[in-house]
Amino acid sequence: MGMKFQKILVLAGIVIGFLSIIVVLAGTLLKNSVPNVLAPVERHFAFDYVIVGGGTGGSTLTSLLAKNSNGSVLLIEAGGQFGLLSRIPLLTTFQQKGINDWSFLSVPQKHSSRGLIERRQCLPRGKGLGGSANLNYMLHFDGHGPDFDSWRDHHNLSDWSWAQMRSFMAAAKPKNPDMLEIPRRYSKLTEALEEAQAQFAYKDWIFRRSLYNIRNGLRHSVVQQFLNPVIHHSNLRLLPDALVKRIQLAPSPFLQATSILVGIKDEENREKEFSIELLMASGIGDVSALKKLGIPAQHSLPLVGHNLHDHFNLPLFVSMGVTGPTLNQNTLLNPMTLINYLSSGSGPLGNFGVLGNVVSYGGLGAPPYGITFFGAGAIDESALMSISNFKGPAFRALFPRYYNSSQEGFVVISSCLQPKSRGSVGLLNRHMRRNPLIDPNYLSSEEDVACTISAIRSAVELVNSTAFAALHPRIHWPRVQECSNFGPFERDFFDNRPSDQYLECLMRHVGLGSHHPGGTCALGSVVDSQLRLKGVSNVRVVDASVLPRPISGNPNSVVVAIALRAASWILKSELQAGDSK
């Protein structure tokens, strides 16, 4: 009877799987069916607000203006709708390098990425409504007050302290049931983290189980949270699959944007939201750099494109001597995995596998760092190499048991939360959408190396603790040929105390960026305290490029909060203008 029931379950899994594939394909075919599209006859209309880019900031801002403004709103987006595939959390990586990803690559890195092809990092950026919020790993961050206070203290931004931003961060947080928190008893790994929290209570470590922007097993991005509820409003129009090529400035009497070139059409408008590459292509930036590209300068802002920052990670694989459950190929191919997901939105398909993290915000001058726990035992070689740009030997050194489809384990990811390294973004030529020159300049600061080593040492302390002992963990120190002079030596596999030189070598060979870029249109240097482009009266920048310093966590929620605040200023200005008439 048991075997018969099992066969029925297997058959049911196959049938449901087939039906789900049909649904996904149908969603993919319908992905460009954007509602409320700007009609050809409307292309000569004047809009009160034009928002360029439907990413996290753009979608949030569009929602608030369409809902609360008396003016007309046009949202221009280079892509269309993401398909249903993007809604399934565990399939996030399959969205990268696809039609909804700009698929940028960094320039060859000088201080890192030696184990990557051409020493170039993959830099996914979303193309479509929701932008990178439909490519990211859906992790929510409540914010860290000292991040904002440092803007106030070090960048003369008195309007951006935690006291001013706390309410906007709270408003950015989705309410139940639009959030998923990993349960304490989700797996043996989460149970170990729970025990470690009690064991290390004397340390300054903060333990967090992952919070996801997931509802009923589906990604709940800014599209679902903000844009969809207003998408049919009469004062809103959308223009998908459209590239903005240039914004035109003119003095009247102050310098302001007067028109934008979209494809072959000009759309007149009053208030606009833009970002870095478009600014450069429009002749706004460093005049000498623009001249070399043959771009006529309209407005001098020398710091456009500078101050690029991003988090940088070192992943380490830890095998377990017990059954997880952790993500591996056998788990994913089990029919019950699909049945559980389709029936209740639960199980491995219902989140991305990041189960929790541990952070130290530092003290007595120590830099803050984070440790993330990704519950994956078997890493698919072709999938990860495609989205990471790893060379084969580097991947196989990091994940020596990748070929074992039943491998149990997890990946511990160490990173510096406030990296000091700074890079830049520039244009290869005057054509904006050619692959831009993105140089994160990872690990150019020795402080970042020291900070990440501290994170790794703490991660090892956690894995070696009695709280993790029941997992029978074993850290697999990568055998990277170029690092062999420094380790790993046999003793390193017993005491888990490899040298700093070895850890630094690992970082510079197999470390990866976090895809958290920001800073290139920074508050205080490129935009003013109300996000207005300096010297231009009616252009604001509302995305992660305005962050003057890194966020000590995932930045998506902070960008939502920034957009909420920008909307409050814009709506207040509209109200004041109405009162003065």
Curated annotation (Swiss-Prot):
Cofactor: FAD
One Gene Ontology cellular component annotation held by this UniProt entry: extracellular region
Position of the signal peptide: 1-26
The keyword S-adenosyl-L-methionine is annotated on this UniProt entry: no
Residue sites binding FAD per the record: 48-77
InterPro entries (alphabetical): FAD/NAD-bd_sf (IPR036188), GMC_OxRdtase (IPR012132), GMC_OxRdtase_N (IPR000172), GMC_OxRtase_C (IPR007867)
Keywords for this protein: FAD, Flavoprotein, Glycoprotein, Oxidoreductase, Secreted, Sensory transduction, Signal, Vision
Enzyme Commission identifier(s): 1.-.-.-
Catalytic center residues: H516 (proton acceptor)
Pfam families per record: GMC_oxred_C (PF05199), GMC_oxred_N (PF00732)
GO biological process, one term: rhabdomere morphogenesis
GO molecular function per UniProt: flavin adenine dinucleotide binding; oxidoreductase activity; oxidoreductase activity, acting on CH-OH group of donors
Glycosylation sites: N70, N156, N404, N464
Places the protein is found: Secreted
Main location: secreted
Function (record text): Oxidoreductase involved in biosynthesis of 3-hydroxyretinal, a chromophore for rhodopsin Rh1. Not responsible for the initial hydroxylation of the retinal ring but rather acts in a subsequent step in chromophore production. May catalyze the conversion of (3R)-3-hydroxyretinol to the 3S enantiomer.
Family as reported in the entry's similarity comment: Belongs to the GMC oxidoreductase family.
Protein name in UniProt: Neither inactivation nor afterpotential protein G
